[in-house]
Amino acid sequence: MEWQEFDRGVFLVNLLGIVYNPETKMILIGKRENNPYLKELSWSFPGGRPAYKNELEDYLKIEIKKKTNLDVSIEKIIFAKTYPENREFLSIYYLCKVESGEEKVGEKFTEIKWVKPTNVQKYFTTSLHKNLLDYLKTLE
């Protein structure tokens, strides 16, 4: 059965890590190109679509490591949302803390950078929910 046949309750889930450095009060974002699900996407938080074989948090740690070379701990779920650009796409945002590693560009990113949480919106070309933006302000 094709997932498009369901009229509700089926989403393409994406896990995203707000990788935060409490010492510098900065978060890590990555630049992507050619995202097949959100054509407008440029900068994003590291993460990806989970496989069925892993716990969500374990999968997110693996994806962040592949994309940034950083080992992180998962602190908590921050927020979940769908997008006006594609309502079938559900993102779950987690607060993550760097445990070890030196950041470097990895899988699917062409660039990574640390930014002030209140500057994230300057980079993103997709919508960021007001509740997420309000939360990011608390990190500064």
Describe each PLM feature range.
Residues 81-102, 135:
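Active-site-adjacent beta-strand/loop module that shapes the phosphate/pyrophosphate-binding cleft
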Residues 17, 77, 94-96:
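A structural signal for short, well-ordered beta-strand segments
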Residues 104-135:
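NUDIX/MutT-family hydrolases
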Residues 26-66:
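Conserved Nudix-box catalytic region and its N-terminal flanking loop in Nudix hydrolases
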Residues 69-79:
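A short coil-to-beta-strand element that immediately follows conserved catalytic motifs
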Residues 1-16:
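Acidic, metal-coordinating catalytic segment for phosphate/diphosphate chemistry
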